[in-house]
Amino acid sequence: MNSKYLFVFLILNVIFIDLCQGFLWSLIPSAISAVTSLIKKGRRRRELGSQYDYLQDFRKRELDLDDLLSKFPDY
């Protein structure tokens, strides 16, 4: 009697493990693509941030130059 339950348990266990492996094999590629897209977005934000900082520095230098030129109106 116990051997019959053990056999049923093993069959159900194999089916469950097979289903889990199928689920994981379908889940892993989508998880990898999601992580890579997040990494790319992070890089893009960092690049845009550095471009924005450069633009702010350029505007500040431009304003400093205008301020300097306003002190010497002849030039």
Swiss-Prot record:
Residues modified to Lysine amide: 41
**GO BP annotations, alphabetical order:** regulation of defense response to virus
This entry carries the following GO cellular component terms, namely: extracellular region
Keyword Signal recorded: yes
Signal peptide, first to last residue: 1-22
Question: Where does this protein reside within or beyond the cell?
Answer: Secreted
Q: Which positions are cleaved off as the propeptide during maturation? A: 47-75
Where is this protein primarily located? secreted
Q: What keyword terms does UniProt attach to this protein?
A: Amidation, Antimicrobial, Antiviral protein, Secreted, Signal
Tissue specificity statement from the Swiss-Prot or TrEMBL entry: Expressed by the venom gland.
Q: What family, per the record? A: Belongs to the non-disulfide-bridged peptide (NDBP) superfamily. Short antimicrobial peptide (group 4) family.
Miscellaneous remark of the record: Shows a low ability to inhibit hepatitis C virus (HCV) infection in Huh7.5.1 cells, and no ability to inhibit hepatitis B virus in HepG2.2.15 cells.
* Name of this protein: Peptide Ctri10036
Tell me which species this is from: Chaerilus tricostatus
- Taxonomic lineage of the native organism: Eukaryota, Metazoa, Ecdysozoa, Arthropoda, Chelicerata
